[in-house]
Amino acid sequence: MAGHEVQYGKHRTRRSFSRIKEVLDLPNLIEIQTDSFQDFLDAGLKEVFEDVLPISNFTDTMDLEFVGYELKEPKYTLEEARIHDASYSAPIFVTFRLVNKETGEIKTQEVFFGDFPIMTEMGTFIINGGERIIVSQLVRSPGVYFNDKVDKNGKVGYGSTVIPNRGAWLELETDAKDIAYTRIDRTRKIPFTTLVRALGFSGDDEIVDIFGDSELVRNTIEKDIHKNPSDSRTDEALKEIYERLRPGEPKTADSSRSLLVARFFDPRRYDLAAVGRYKINKKLNLKTRLLNQTIAENLVDGETGEILVEAGTVMTRDVIDSIAEHIDGDLNKFVYTPNDYAVVTEPVILQKFKVVAPTDPDRVVTIVGNSNPEDKVRALTPADILAEMSYFLNLAEGIGKVDDIDHLGNRRIRAVGELLANQFRIGLARMERNVRERMSVQDNEVLTPQQIINIRPVTAAVKEFFGSSQLSQFMDQHNPLSELSHKRRLSALGPGGLTRDRAGYEVRDVHYTHYGRMCPIETPEGPNIGLINNLSSFGHLNKYGFIQTPYRKVDRSTGAVTNEIVWLTADEEDEFTVAQANSKLNEDGTFAEEIVMGRHQGNNQEFPSSIVDFVDVSPKQVVAVATACIPFLENDDSNRALMGANMQRQAVPLIDPKAPYVGTGMEYQAAHDSGAAVIAKHDGRVIFSDAEKVEVRREDGSLDVYHVQKFRRSNSGTAYNQRTLVKVGDLVEKGDFIADGPSMENGEMALGQNPVVAYMTWEGYNFEDAVIMSERLVKEDVYTSVHLEEFESETRDTKLGPEEITREIPNVGEDSLRDLDEMGIIRIGAEVKEGDILVGKVTPKGEKDLSAEERLLHAIFGDKSREVRDTSLRVPHGGDGVVRDVKIFTRANGDELQSGVNMLVRVYIAQKRKIKVGDKMAGRHGNKGVVSRIVPVEDMPYLPDGTPVDIMLNPLGVPSRMNIGQVMELHLGMAARNLGIHIATPVFDGASSEDLWETVQEAGMDSDAKTVLYDGRTGEPFDNRVSVGVMYMIKLHHMVDDKLHARSVGPYSLVTQQPLGGKAQFGGQRFGEMEVWALEAYGASNVLQEILTYKSDDVTGRLKAYEAITKGKPIPKPGVPESFRVLVKELQSLGLDMRVLDEDDNEVELRDLDEGEDDDVMHVDDLEKARVKQEAEEKQAEQVSEVVQED
């Protein structure tokens, strides 16, 4: 027997074909959300407060200081928040200290700081009753970047940019004349020496001393001449910079100094963040810059006078490692003191080394380092600027390397915690201005923190972020896999990110650093391709927000692959050679072969096993969760695999889902971590279990109660239904499944079913990927799903009185009210069809709406029914089903309703949708199709043992698409069905063709895995043997019921008077320019005329036509379309005298758009109302005559 048994949870065993020993379990798949939010609560929020506070008043006599904060208990539970359309949030209380510096008085007070949304255990937020997710953002990391550019003459120039987390950009660039310029915050460029002089190093010799003698430096110094001898060089430089930054304003050296300090050296205005400081120190680090350079001077230990390295030595990795402590210490450190006019007057410590120029052995190049400022230095320092300039000048000498902007070492993730902290900071900054004014205006003696703090800007910023940010998204809740994928999504869009239109090909493309960090397969098709990605299965964020991936360490001394796990970011990995997970190993862990496949930077090639540093942890670390659920992924073309991964996320939860016979072993973990199942929080024994509740007694005697959701409406309108798995007396351990969620079976993801599939044509019905299906799948509810739709009706106060929910609806027969209760609300369990009343509601009608007869009747009989009109909630088109639930919210019950709303009624209607012609189906390999025909079971082809086939697919769908995985799954699935087992074939480590055939033979199938099929209609065998097997097929969310749409009478657009478009607006079908050509080609003039007039925007004509049709008269001639009038008006607005003349040159009067319609022109709706009114009046007249007769 090929393969070995593996247990997944307590309910499923699979035969696995994996050969690679897994040394690391998958991490919790939603930790990117939960860890980041927890981080924010533990440290991020405190950091934001400490950044903005203390706040001083303008006279600096008072300080408002931050002491601490506390989150109290949430107002609503999760379920209550969902029901009441509220947010699941906790009140936050912040303690402030107000210090009066003149009197020394201190007032400490706790201030309510608004309600802060809290993340649920599932990694989601509940905002206004809807479940939302904050998508992590992929942005360019703060730091220093160097790039090269080639001009039109083929000359190579260099550029450099310092990008902060917030603050001004500082750029350097060279031009065609070999002069180096700098730009501050995208303004006009100035010679870079001007900025050096402004920093207090004004002499030409001083500049050459710092940077060394090079052509770029000399050329720039020549360009940067001393124009005004009355100013010092530094003052002149400062004024020149000020002129660039604030053109047109009077320039003084003092104002320029304070401006530069504010731009770069003030931590409140300029912030590199921890990650920016880390990246700058790493890029400007001398150990990497000196690597493989020839040193041009003796390196001498300053304390002992010992020569550490002699001039002429090549600085190899070993040489650098031997003096690393000295380089990190005080080796070659020089103190430069700026002159008195400088922006920053503190001494600047630089570390300088002289090396031989790689291009010219007779020249010496100076390499300047920033002497590694500490991590907590978040602003730029003069040493950083000088070291950056040095690196930039060194590039022209061939020392150093340019950066690849798409490298994942230069792109980082802003997860939910950081995004929230940024938003909170914006709110606090707005509040700060407000507080400062209040502190200055009001009397110091009586002030308390409560009085000067206005929390509205903070709560508004947070609310705005959750409600309308591009990164706060309505959770994709089609099925548990789509939830999980959404939580692990990485978007390059959003504020501070890219825009779709500007993003080029390079940003979207797969980069070698994506390996193990971002999935190369799972990304949307269309304009967002490559901009929205998914975290790979083992991906994990470090403290700086860079994605790490795990590797097994190779012990270089023994050559053995250890089980020690090392997590590496992309730029750390660049220094090492990594072998693949499937490298063959001996018993002792050493490599079995001399040469192994591996990766170093962007190169995939064979390496000697002796130089390998790390080995991949698992073959599936390359791909995301959805991609890892595709069996035989290695046999599919990448484009189709992309569709397969994306379509699994669109699967509709079925009534009775089944886990796949052929899985990948990922189904269990995905279901477990998705948050859609009920998972045990502690060990214990089940003491009570039913469909809605499970109670578990813990070992310490306490009780855990788990609630099981039944048929709740999900965000996608599908049924979110959990099924209890445990029985009374069962022992459960922490992490066990207590109940399956939607699309799960026995604790495994189960998105579809396992039908018997044959690759064959049948009467041409599976032309172009169409799917032929057996009626069994309809009758036995194999592909039946439940959908829940929510409808609501609210009563408001109007000018004429309040609206009412009632059973007494004018002009509605008793038959239509049979399922309404005494209040006029539909009963639960009622079957409703389109147009049925769900909530009876009447709205007061003004006197002006009444006709003369109605007023007379009102006067005689005091008949109230005439004063209201029917505004009941009715079932819309395609909305028929069974009423599942009704919720009523009123002010009297203490429910929070919008202002002006007195009562809100929500009705939930459940639909049971069987699969039908027009529904979309798919396999897991991107093989999608539409159901074209449902054939009676007796007509379907059948196997020799009499089993009818369930689905027939077109064999032509396989070769050109190159997704051969589906064929392998088909054969293995049939073997699994015959053997009565489930199989796991993990991606890139699954069943080989030998395993496949061995299993096929074990199952007693023919050696080619094909079979004779018999025609169900004739009983004759088909000419050729057919591939028949079991394939996992899913039903997708694109169902024909949601797309079918027809219009007879409906709404029109206000300006053009043409029908609206789309199903949601009950619109018409657009008959466009090309369709008009088609009818013109056939000469179908009358058909064309009525399409362009009655059916579109001939307002008068369509009303007369409607009238004629209802009264059975001939249809009159059409008039002038409204769009013609619009054209005339548009030309008149351009000042053209445009008139319409008839054959006799008489002017034709066009009805003016703004004059309102003529009285004799009625709307279609008015005609409909008139008909109803006429019937009602006839009824009324009958009642009157009856009354008269009785009298």
Curated annotation (Swiss-Prot):
UniProt keyword annotation of Nucleotidyltransferase present: yes
Residue stretches of biased makeup (Low complexity):
1182-1191
Q: In Gene Ontology terms, what is one molecular function of this protein? A: DNA-directed RNA polymerase activity
Skewed-composition ranges (Basic and acidic residues) = 1171-1181
For this protein, the Enzyme Commission number is 2.7.7.6
**Gene Ontology biological process terms, A to Z:** DNA-templated transcription
Residue ranges annotated as transmembrane are: none
Alphabetic keyword roster: DNA-directed RNA polymerase, Nucleotidyltransferase, Transcription, Transferase
UniProt catalytic activity:
RNA(n) + a ribonucleoside 5'-triphosphate = RNA(n+1) + diphosphate
Q: Name one GO cellular component term.
A: DNA-directed RNA polymerase complex
* InterPro entries attached to this UniProt entry: DNA-dir_RNA_pol_bsu_ext_1_sf (IPR042107), DNA-dir_RNA_pol_bsu_external_1 (IPR019462), DNA-dir_RNA_pol_su2 (IPR015712), DNA-dir_RNAP_su2_dom (IPR007120), DNA-dir_RNAP_su2_hyb_sf (IPR037033), RNA_pol_bsu_bac (IPR010243), RNA_pol_bsu_CS (IPR007121), RNA_pol_bsu_protrusion (IPR007644)
Q: Which residues, by range, are in coiled-coil regions?
A: none
Stretches the record annotates as Disordered: 1171-1191
Instruction: Report if keyword Nucleotidyltransferase is assigned.
Output: yes
- So which domain of life are we looking at? Bacteria
Q: Assembly and partners?
A: The RNAP catalytic core consists of 2 alpha, 1 beta, 1 beta' and 1 omega subunit. When a sigma factor is associated with the core the holoenzyme is formed, which can initiate transcription.
Membership in a protein family: Belongs to the RNA polymerase beta chain family.
Role played = DNA-dependent RNA polymerase catalyzes the transcription of DNA into RNA using the four ribonucleoside triphosphates as substrates.
- PANTHER family to which the protein is assigned, alphabetical: DNA-DIRECTED RNA POLYMERASE I SUBUNIT 2
The name on file for this protein is: DNA-directed RNA polymerase subunit beta
Organism the protein comes from: Streptococcus agalactiae serotype V (strain ATCC BAA-611 / 2603 V/R)
**What does the organism's lineage look like at the top?**
Bacteria, Bacillati, Bacillota, Bacilli, Lactobacillales
